[in-house]
Design a protein with these regions (language model features):
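Hydrophobic alpha-helical transmembrane segments
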Residues: 52-57, 213-214, 247-255
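Transmembrane-helix boundary/entry motifs in multi-pass membrane transporters
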Residues: 1-11, 28-32, 39-52, 79, ...
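Membrane-water interface regions at transmembrane-helix termini and the short interhelical loops
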Residues: 1-10, 57-81, 143-151, 236-241
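Membrane-embedded helix-loop-helix hairpins and adjacent transmembrane boundary segments
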Residues: 209, 251, 258-270
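Generic alpha-helical transmembrane segments of integral inner-membrane proteins
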Residues: 56-64, 86-90, 167-174, 255, ...
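Inter-helical loop and helix-membrane interface segments of multi-pass membrane transporters/permeases
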Residues: 1-2, 15-71, 100-124, 191-195, ...
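Membrane-embedded translocation segments of transport machinery
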Residues: 75, 79-224, 228, 241-242, ...
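Membrane-interface helix-loop-helix modules in multi-pass membrane proteins
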Residues: 1-36, 143, 160-181
Length: 270
């Protein structure tokens, strides 16, 4: 059905991006950002065969977590990492807004351009944000909802998810977009902005090496917790339809997603 296909399609795309995050976490540990041109570093990686091993690693981590049943451990770690991410965001926000020309980015975010409301692409991008950010693609929420305890206040939980999702997105926008203006980057570049703007900010701040590691580690936990949802939902649908085992369903879905995403690996950010 459509919700299942949509969550699988998201899983296909998301695996590529999680691979990028793993690569940048590794690069932040090595301190690569301090010795290279950051934009060229990204362009030499994204859209090339170099992404394949990181994408493969992302898929292996995801299926291992699902099959070994260590999701509870990820949830417990997220109770630490997600608040830590908000603290890191706050520090980065303060540093970003003190960069030269950053206020132009703030104006870009806050001054409305009403004519864009009449352009279909605006609504498509807004739906895409909801689609990815809040997982409003049906199946994932249904599968996770089936695991809830009977006494969970679902409307209140949903409200909290929406609020914290919106707050984190707004914080990220006020870090990345002003940062893009400060370093002369195109604010409409899309997902690649995270991987170009943030290393620039880390280079320009005290203890940037440490904050870079913590930032990308937090993003890994956020990304893994999301992609687990996508695999769980897709594998659950496969199990129900083909009456097979959890292991087989998870393996087939993961393998199919990786293979389908190879053209994305070789073309994204190009």
């Amino acid at each position: 059905n459509i919700p299942t296909l949509s969550v699988f399609g998201t899983f296909v795309f998301y695996g590529v991006v999680v691979g990028w995050v793993l690569k940048y976490f590794y690069a932040s540990i090595k301190g690569d950002f301090y010795n290279v041109d950051i934009a060229n570093y990204f362009n030499s990686f994204a859209g090339t065969s170099a992404t394949l091993k990181w994408h493969f690693l992302a898929m292996v981590i995801t299926i291992v977590i699902v099959l070994l049943g260590v999701i509870k451990g990820i949830e417990r770690m997220n109770k630490i990492m997600m608040p830590a991410l908000f603290v890191i965001f706050t520090v980065l926000l303060i540093r970003t807004l003190t960069l030269p020309n950053a206020m132009e980015g703030v104006k870009y975010l806050l001054i409305p351009r009403w004519e864009y409301l009449f352009k279909p692409i605006t609504w498509v991008m807004a739906l895409g944000q909801a689609f990815f950010s809040a997982s409003l693609n049906g199946a994932g929420m249904v599968v996770y909802g089936s695991y809830l305890k009977k006494d969970v206040d679902i409307p209140n939980a949903a409200l909290q998810v929406a609020i914290f999702d919106a707050v984190s997105a707004i914080l990220a926008a006020f870090i990345i977009i002003p940062g893009a203006f400060a370093f002369g980057l195109d604010p409409t570049s899309g997902p690649s902005l995270l991987f170009i703007t943030m290393p620039h900010i880390f280079k320009a701040m005290p203890f940037g090496y440490l904050f870079g590691i913590l930032f990308f580690l937090s993003i890994i936990f956020a990304a893994i917790s999301s992609i687990i949802n996508m695999l769980e939902a897709s594998a659950d649908a496969y199990m129900s339809f083909f009456k097979t085992t959890r292991f087989k369903a998870s393996f087939i879905v993961t393998a199919a997603a990786f293979i389908i995403a190879i053209p994305l690996d070789l073309s994204m950010a190009r």
